[in-house]
């Protein structure tokens, strides 16, 4: 089975959802995930496919999924549930369900999604894995899903309700119990036939030709690693680093003589153990070593290159710098009284001593998150204190955060000696890296076992960072809306307004907005370091159909994804991107649309992004196909996707708040 645990959105910054999802917005989440999974799996042999579980199409909870410690989820109706998540109900209106939580699933279904996992919790009062409206009504009938549904960890409380509600596999029944239920009429034979057809058809579709379909009774460990994957993982990790601050063009580092390395996140946990799956217990706000993944159900990395490992390799390779390190977040800041006399006088190792003696100080901190429990805080006081302690004595403090979602930074981001900042966040059980350099800052995501190399590649300018934030970093935790619901009726009162949509609607100034990220330029010479610059121009809107006589509703026959005309291309929006700097770099152009007032929609919504690599002086054109779906809202009165006639705003920019070119568009419906 190919499966990929996606896509998850969450309305609360501390919830586990950010550890298991890709972003805080629904745009094309699944489309890109499916393309990546397909690219990964296609070259595999049938033997490899039979022996390896890749996780592609089975996602962690269809629609609202936020269960864990304090839960906003879906379950319980007067029954005695052992699992706390099953006592909790995610209650939300139909428009929010469709425009936020269902949206990325539509991409998955449209791209041939094979299987879906139903959630443990309740949705609007009904257990997710027994919910006929969610599984049959919306997923199978409304979106045209042709695959099968599996349960999350625990079987439904009512086995028959699960089968009748759409659950096709592992309902909790034995074969003999199912046969008896069919025989006595409590489960119609037609229901079981449909489930069987969906399972077999999906397997044959993914593992054709059918006569070669591998069905091993016993499986053995099989090495499917491609030696070249190491380089890919390293490059993907470094290109996923988000640079958030780079004061005085601190990065890339140019022939440094001495580095100070601080923080437990700089090295692997010396005594072990390696991370273990633990779904039940809160594991703390931070991890006691270099964090490369969120906790939970995942395949462990075969090895981990920490930042200290990577720096050691670079120093040993004749790079001309030395380093000292303190691999602790709470080491002595100032020296104790001196002992000894003359040449033998010493005052002991301290943070202040190593910071003073270092040309640049690298501070590594992290924020941990895991499946089975929510995060307790958005900032770690010990880590914040370490940053300030180092920055008090080091004029060039570079902060690298490996974190499982949002991590507040206002305790130190304005410190005059913090020159660089980067941020890494675990997504899909992976970690993002944010870098802040005092004077600068980057963020990194998903470098896994090559994490240390990926970070160091950016620090020394081997790779120009070009990634963008996939969530908003606020100035205060109080700026976020949505609160963890302990139990049991959890109302999604924020509706459509999560993350940047909330900040825009409420007029709140973030510290770093959704989509933000810096880059620097380096031509490989040690004395070159500056921002590369990009310009956006020539924004054009080309209708693909008559936009003055549009039908308001999508009414086509149901295909995979929904009504066929929902995917009709209405417009093509294009623009030119130019590199006006002196060296090569990459820009992520982001397209946002605003809807007419009558739509009562968020201020702006992401509807496209494109990453382009440009040589100095080069210009490339980007284009964004806009479907009917991109211009529609969910009409709760008719239960249909609807285009609201009126003026639409079209903006292209570098983030959700930094716009470079704007246009307006008027759509008329009949």
From Swiss-Prot:
Entry keyword Kinase: no
GO biological process, alphabetically ordered: cellulose catabolic process; glucan catabolic process
Pathway: Glycan metabolism; cellulose degradation
Subcellular location: Secreted
InterPro entries: Cellulose_deg_GH3 (IPR050288), Fn3-like (IPR026891), Glyco_hydro_3_C (IPR002772), Glyco_hydro_3_C_sf (IPR036881), Glyco_hydro_3_N_sf (IPR036962), Glycoside_hydrolase_SF (IPR017853), Ig-like_fold (IPR013783)
Keywords (A to Z) from UniProt: Carbohydrate metabolism, Cellulose degradation, Glycoprotein, Glycosidase, Hydrolase, Polysaccharide degradation, Secreted, Signal
Ranges for region Disordered: 65-87
Glycosylated residues in this chain: 51, 141, 184, 248, 330, 417
Signal peptide: 1-21
Predominant place of localization: secreted
Enzyme class: hydrolase
GO molecular function: beta-glucosidase activity
Active site: 152
Listed GO CC annotations: extracellular region
Swiss-Prot/TrEMBL catalytic activity: Hydrolysis of terminal, non-reducing beta-D-glucosyl residues with release of beta-D-glucose
Domain of life: Eukaryota
EC number: 3.2.1.21
PANTHER family: BETA-GLUCOSIDASE, BETA-GLUCOSIDASE M-RELATED
Similarity annotation: Belongs to the glycosyl hydrolase 3 family.
The protein's role, per its UniProt record: Beta-glucosidases are one of a number of cellulolytic enzymes involved in the degradation of cellulosic biomass. Catalyzes the last step releasing glucose from the inhibitory cellobiose.
Protein name as annotated: Probable beta-glucosidase N
Organism of origin: Emericella nidulans (strain FGSC A4 / ATCC 38163 / CBS 112.46 / NRRL 194 / M139)
Name of the gene encoding the protein in the UniProt record: bglN
